[in-house]
From Swiss-Prot:
PROSITE patterns: THIOREDOXIN_2 (PS51352). It comes from Rattus norvegicus. It is found in: Cell projection, Cilium membrane. Residues 326-343 are cytoplasmic. This is Thioredoxin domain-containing protein 15. Pfam families: Thioredoxin (PF00085). The lineage of its organism: Eukaryota, Metazoa, Chordata, Craniata, Vertebrata.
Length: 343
């Protein structure tokens, strides 16, 4: 037993130097071992290290492929080597497969999302993918032009019979007075068109429209133009739904066909309205002149007494005074009634 114990102690003492030599040789082997190129998904810091890394990966891939057996999916083989697998994916991205899957695919944008080592170059590639087809945006103006040409070829909504203007030189607007009826100036059996204006002389909107409406007979000599005071022809205003002035209606014969609903009441907008409804083009070089400012439709406000407004104010004041007097009398009666109940 003593010999066995001394033998174990001797082996332990002799084993210490051998263990130290083994550790020294291990450190030496690790120091002599070449450090592989820094890569995360085959992103190298420079081109030389990338080339060295590819050569080392190629040598390692050969025994791996031999151990896996016959040829299989190259992506399965390269999955053992992260750098080579990522190079294969980057090659597919440049071939166009990633663009079909969209930018949200992690295989396409993995490098930029991890470290952003490629810088602005990656964003430039994306912009090229986004704006690679400018022809789609250029096709829209063509479609718009086709739509405009189609609208211009549409038939007018109202087929107006143009009147004969041979021998006529003065084309003016006719204003109806209180005794005249609108139906007397419209032909119920005909298809000629007339533009009728409902206005009031004290309305500032009617006054601002007057010069533009006065110039319309010169722009459309084959059409008729009438104007009437809506306050004097209340029955006609109610019949044709005139709740506000100015109100412009287009008549074909004695039938109203269209109403002008634009807030911008100018000569140009009126020309467009008539052309869209009848298809009749206005004469060129027709503008609002100084004579149109003077008449026949007045362009200045006419100051008159509105008797209806005066009566309304008188009634309102009378009612307020009566209510005030009755309230005071009620206040005097209430205390007396309380005393009677108390007795």
């Amino acid at each position: 037993m003593q010999l066995l114990c001394w033998w174990q102690i001797l082996l332990w003492v002799l084993g210490l130097p051998a263990r130290g030599l083994e550790e020294d040789s291990g450190h030496t082997w690790q120091e002599e071992r070449p450090v592989p190129a820094l890569q995360v998904g085959s992103v190298y810091l420079n081109e030389e290290e990338a080339a060295q890394g590819h050569r080392v990966q190629a040598r390692v891939a050969e025994p791996s492929e031999a151990s896996l057996g016959p040829r299989g999916d190259p992506m399965v083989v390269l999955s053992v080597i992260p750098g080579a697998a990522e190079d294969q994916r980057s090659t597919e991205a440049h071939d166009g497969t990633c663009s079909a899957q969209g930018d949200e695919d992690p295989r396409c944008g993995g490098r930029e999302n991890l470290f952003g080592l490629q810088g602005a170059g990656g964003f430039q590639d994306r912009e090229e993918e986004y704006y690679a087809e400018p022809g789609v945006a250029e096709a829209e103006p063509v479609a718009t032009e086709d739509a405009n040409s189609t609208d211009s070829l549409k038939s007018p909504k109202v087929n107006c019979e143009e009147r004969n203007v041979t021998g006529l030189e003065n084309f003016t607007l006719k204003i109806l007075n209180m005794s005249q009826d609108l139906m007397d100036f419209l032909n119920p059996n005909g298809s000629d068109c007339t533009l009728v204006l409902f206005y009031t002389p004290w309305c500032r909107f009617s006054a601002s429209l007057a010069p533009h409406f006065n110039s319309l007979p010169r722009a459309f000599p084959t059409l008729g133009f009438l104007a009437l005071d809506a306050s004097q022809h209340s029955s006609l205003s109610t019949r044709f739904g005139t709740v506000a002035v100015p109100n412009i209606l287009l008549f074909q014969g004695a039938k109203p066909m269209a109403r002008f609903n634009h807030t911008d009441r100018t000569l140009e907008t009126l020309k467009i309205f008539i052309f869209n409804q009848t298809g009749i083009e206005a004469k060129k070089n027709v503008v609002v002149t100084q004579a149109d400012q003077l008449g026949p439709l007045p362009s200045t406000l006419v100051k008159t007494v509105d008797w209806l407004l005066v009566f309304s104010l008188f009634f309102l004041i009378s009612f307020i005074m009566y209510a005030t007097i009755r309230t005071e009398s009620i206040r005097w009666l209430i205390p007396g009634q309380e005393q009677e109940h108390a007795e």
